């Protein structure tokens, strides 16, 4: 049976309310086999018992204008063989017909279903006759405290009375005004679109405090169910979930019991996911056996803020990624002097909160807590949301990607940013007994904030970060990250290591350099006309040992440093400590003689339009270095299968075919 068929079967069970009676806050659903199983939450008024024989035909009664004798027979079965005009007779004061009085006064369940079914024979004109208030008989059920809800359900579910959208709105308003919360719940199960009208009705109608609280609860729960449903089960399940909540059966156990009773297929995965998210509590991370004890220890240190202490500006989106969306927000705290202060923060809300996804979110939280403030933004804590939770971190001005794009970058700023970046990586690799690898270093994941004294640069998004341990070997071998920045050794099934982060850092340096030299930000390997898709462009470039072209006028020491960070052979790359030392040396060299580093627009234009001998020699030198290394190291025998271009003529011909020539 498909998910759709499953939904239809279960929805039918949810909607076919066999016996409904009113309690103070919920609607109870019972299947009644006989009179003994009927359980009422409120005591029934005493019924007048007649000693004379029961009168079964209302045609034999002489009715008074105000139906004064209806109370004498309203608890018994009705004979519908009398003249139909009789049922249209109206009370002179209220204008109520027989059916109005029936809906208002009926107190016995005996033969109730058959009596309501027999009303169909009276015809639409009779059934939908209106009183002096222009109300059909359905409105009279509001005054029936004993069986009003039951009669309303029978009239609607048996299609005895049909009400259009305007009629539903009027009935909903009347139910709210009368405080008939039970009927409001039922009407929502009939037409879930009425939910959207509750707030508007509350604004224009005078309602009791109890009713207002009920409307607020209904709206908040519906928003929660919609938010979960759209992400987990889809729109088709939202109505089913909410109906179960309204009927008071919103628990996994009750649905499973229904499945067993009706011998339905096993519960769909969508509903399993839904219940996990709906019933999720912040402390549930201790139940996730997939989380290692060392992570649990870090997570337990994180502060949990109530939602009232945090405001989230949903319209002010700071960033979006595959693992979540970051919003601007404000955290209210009390300072040492007892004054309330507002702290600008960023709030990351994970995309999904299923069990499998939560494990990854908690791992990210644990690493964030472990390196808190050392090489990443400060972690304030978490806030429990309507659905799941949000991660509260220090707010920065922008990402490095946006900073490069919107600012002029010279070599002074290049060295300032590059040094801060590589020092951050060094701190990340050394801040724990087991090294921590970021695994997704790129300009988008660097945050920049300008203070009075300095430019602060930190790493963000630790969703892929992992410790260097034996238990993480399988994870460190997986192909993860952003294509252009992924180190080439991952294609060769080599474990992610410290120097893998260095490769991604080197590619980020190239993007900085492009802005310094060309005045605009370009993606790495943009010179090569291989493919419009970044992934394929990167793969082809790496397989053929190409590197981004660096202007030849720059000092050789600087070019060698950049090339070393992006070396195809990871063992030939410098580690983070060596990168810091070499950058400091290069910065000193730059400050001593800036004329060597001046951007020569004429040379740049020539190199962008033609393949100069220096560029060809540069590529030849790099490829021959790889060739020599491969021949001397059996460990990299897999590289020998790759086609290499070693002669200068072959390199020139190859580069000419893929370089993007610009006039």
From Swiss-Prot:
Alphabetical list of Pfam families matching this protein: Pkinase
GO biological process per UniProt: regulation of translational initiation
Keywords: ATP-binding, Kinase, Nucleotide-binding, Serine/threonine-protein kinase, Transferase
Keyword Metal-binding appears in the UniProt entry: no
Disulfides per UniProt: none
Catalytic activity from the UniProt record: L-seryl-[protein] + ATP = O-phospho-L-seryl-[protein] + ADP + H(+); L-threonyl-[protein] + ATP = O-phospho-L-threonyl-[protein] + ADP + H(+)
Occurrences of domain Protein kinase (ranges): 312-586
The protein's enzyme class: transferase
Enzyme Commission number(s) of this protein: 2.7.11.1
GO molecular function annotations of the record: ATP binding; eukaryotic translation initiation factor 2alpha kinase activity; protein serine kinase activity
Residues given in the record as ATP binding sites: 318-326, 348
Similarity annotation: Belongs to the protein kinase superfamily. Ser/Thr protein kinase family.
Protein name: Probable serine/threonine-protein kinase DDB_G0283301
Species in which this protein is naturally found: Dictyostelium discoideum (Social amoeba)
Taxonomic classification: Eukaryota, Amoebozoa, Evosea, Eumycetozoa, Dictyostelia
């Amino acid at each position: 049976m498909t998910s759709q068929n499953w939904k239809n079967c279960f929805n039918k069970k949810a909607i076919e309310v066999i016996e409904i009676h009113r309690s103070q806050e919920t609607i109870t659903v019972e299947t009644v086999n006989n009179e003994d199983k009927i359980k009422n939450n409120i005591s029934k008024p005493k019924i007048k018992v007649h000693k004379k024989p029961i009168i079964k035909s209302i045609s034999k009664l002489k009715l008074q204008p105000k139906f004064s004798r209806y109370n004498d027979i309203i608890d018994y079965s009705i004979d519908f063989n009398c003249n139909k005009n009789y049922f249209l007779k109206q009370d002179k004061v209220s204008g109520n017909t027989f059916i109005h009085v029936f809906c208002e006064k009926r107190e016995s369940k005996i033969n109730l279903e058959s009596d309501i079914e027999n009303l169909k024979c009276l015809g639409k004109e009779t059934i939908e006759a209106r009183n002096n208030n222009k109300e059909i008989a359905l409105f009279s059920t509001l005054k029936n405290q004993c069986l009003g809800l039951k009669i309303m359900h029978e009239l609607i579910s048996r299609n005895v009375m049909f009400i259009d959208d305007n009629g539903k709105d009027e009935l909903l308003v009347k139910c709210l005004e009368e405080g008939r919360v039970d009927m409001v719940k039922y009407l929502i199960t009939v037409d879930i679109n009425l939910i959207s009208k509750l707030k508007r009705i509350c604004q224009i109608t005078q309602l009791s405090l109890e009713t207002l609280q009920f409307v607020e609860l209904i709206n908040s729960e519906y928003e929660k169910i919609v938010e979960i449903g759209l992400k987990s089960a889809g729109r088709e399940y939202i109505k089913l979930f909410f109906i179960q909540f309204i009927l008071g059966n919103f628990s996994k156990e009750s649905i499973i019991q229904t499945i067993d009773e009706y011998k339905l297929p096993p519960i769909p995965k969508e509903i399993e996911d839904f219940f996990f998210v709906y019933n999720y509590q912040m402390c549930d991370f201790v139940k996730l056996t997939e989380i290692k004890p060392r992570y649990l220890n870090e997570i337990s240190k994180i502060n949990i803020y109530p939602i009232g202490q945090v405001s989230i500006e949903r319209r002010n989106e700071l960033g979006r990624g595959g693992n979540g969306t970051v919003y601007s927000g404000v955290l209210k705290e009390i300072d040492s002097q007892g004054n309330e202060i507002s702290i600008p923060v960023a709030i990351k809300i994970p995309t999904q909160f299923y069990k499998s996804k939560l494990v990854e979110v908690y791992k990210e939280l644990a690493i964030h807590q472990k390196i808190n403030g050392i090489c990443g933004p400060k972690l304030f804590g978490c806030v429990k949301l309507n659905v799941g939770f949000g991660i509260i971190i220090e707010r920065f001005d922008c990402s490095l990607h946006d900073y490069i794009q919107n600012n002029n970058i010279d070599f002074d700023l290049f060295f300032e940013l590059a040094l801060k970046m590589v020092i951050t990586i060094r701190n990340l690799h050394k801040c724990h007994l087991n090294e921590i690898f970021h695994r997704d270093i790129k300009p988008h994941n660097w945050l920049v904030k300008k203070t009075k004294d300095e430019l602060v640069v930190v790493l963000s998004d630790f969703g892929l970060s992992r410790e260097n341990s034996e238990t993480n070997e399988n994870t460190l071998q997986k192909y993860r990250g952003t294509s252009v920045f992924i180190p080439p050794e991952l294609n060769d099934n080599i474990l992610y290591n410290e120097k893998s982060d260095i490769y991604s850092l080197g590619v980020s340096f190239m993007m900085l350099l492009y802005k310094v030299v060309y005045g605009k930000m370009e993606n790495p390997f943009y010179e090569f006309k291989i493919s419009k898709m970044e992934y394929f462009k990167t793969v082809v470039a790496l397989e053929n040992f190409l590197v981004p072209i660096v202007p030849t006028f720059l000092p050789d020491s600087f070019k060698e440093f950049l090339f070393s960070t992006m070396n195809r052979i990871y063992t030939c790359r410098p580690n983070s400590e060596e990168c810091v030392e070499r950058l400091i040396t290069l910065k000193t060299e730059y400050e001593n003689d800036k004329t060597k580093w001046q951007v020569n627009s004429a040379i740049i234009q020539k190199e962008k339009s033609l393949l100069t001998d220096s560029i060809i020699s540069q590529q030849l030198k790099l490829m021959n270095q790889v060739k020599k290394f491969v021949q001397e190291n059996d460990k990299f025998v897999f590289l020998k299968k790759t086609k290499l271009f070693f002669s200068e003529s072959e390199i020139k011909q190859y580069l000419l075919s893929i370089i993007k020539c610009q006039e």
